[in-house]
């Protein structure tokens, strides 16, 4: 989403499952760090880089990988292979209203620091993804194969 009329939009927003609000979520690809992880399945706590799977301009083609900026906001502009742009997926004990037990949380896990949950915060009126210090504070994610 383009906040601030940037040449390459870099905001990563939380998709709200409310009709008419921010449209549909955008598909992502999980790029595994290790070549030993084969197949289509990304296992929990595997080191991954998260990359939007969207059409983009030639100018912005390198602006699709997620990272955390100095304000602790999740933005694009990361690089696959950069140890600071590592994320992990962790299973939670939550259950969806429909009864699914496949509810996860995302962690940002730069190599030189411990992992932090990805939570939410409204910044300038937008539901932004941010790192949070409280282990119980996180946004639950449900993944749908695109």
Curated annotation (Swiss-Prot):
Q: Which UniProt keywords apply?
A: Disulfide bond, Protease inhibitor, Thiol protease inhibitor, Vacuole
This protein's source sits in the domain of life called Eukaryota
Q: Which cysteines are joined by disulfide bonds?
A: 8-60, 109-115
Q: Does the keyword Disulfide bond apply?
A: yes
Q: What is its main location?
A: other
List, alphabetically, the SMART domains matched. STI (SM00452)
GO cellular component terms, semicolon-separated: vacuole
- Where located? Vacuole
Q: Which InterPro entries match?
A: Kunitz_inhibitor_STI-like_sf, Prot_inh_Kunz-lg
Identify the Pfam families for this entry: Kunitz_legume
SUPFAM superfamilies assigned to the protein according to its UniProt record, in alphabetical order: STI-like (SSF50386)
MF terms from GO for this chain are: cysteine-type endopeptidase inhibitor activity
Main function: Inhibitor of cysteine proteases. May protect the plant by inhibiting proteases of invading organisms.
> Which family does the record assign?
Belongs to the protease inhibitor I3 (leguminous Kunitz-type inhibitor) family.
What name does this protein carry?
A: Cysteine protease inhibitor 3
| UniProt organism field | Solanum tuberosum
């Amino acid at each position: 989403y383009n906040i601030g009329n940037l040449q390459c939009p870099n905001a990563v927003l939380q998709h709200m499952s409310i009709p008419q609000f921010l449209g549909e979520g955008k598909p992502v690809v999980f790029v595994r760090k290790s070549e030993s992880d084969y197949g289509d399945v990304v296992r929990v706590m595997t080191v991954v880089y998260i990359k939007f799977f969207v059409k983009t301009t030639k100018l912005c083609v390198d602006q699709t990988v997620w990272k955390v900026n100095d304000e602790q906001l999740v933005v694009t502009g990361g690089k696959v292979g950069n140890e600071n742009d590592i994320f992990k997926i962790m299973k939670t004990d939550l259950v969806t209203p429909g009864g699914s037990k496949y509810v996860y949380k995302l962690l940002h896990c730069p190599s030189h620091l411990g992992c932090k949950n990805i939570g939410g915060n409204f910044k300038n009126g937008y539901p932004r993804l941010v790192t949070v210090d409280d282990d119980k504070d996180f946004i639950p994610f449900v993944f749908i194969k695109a």
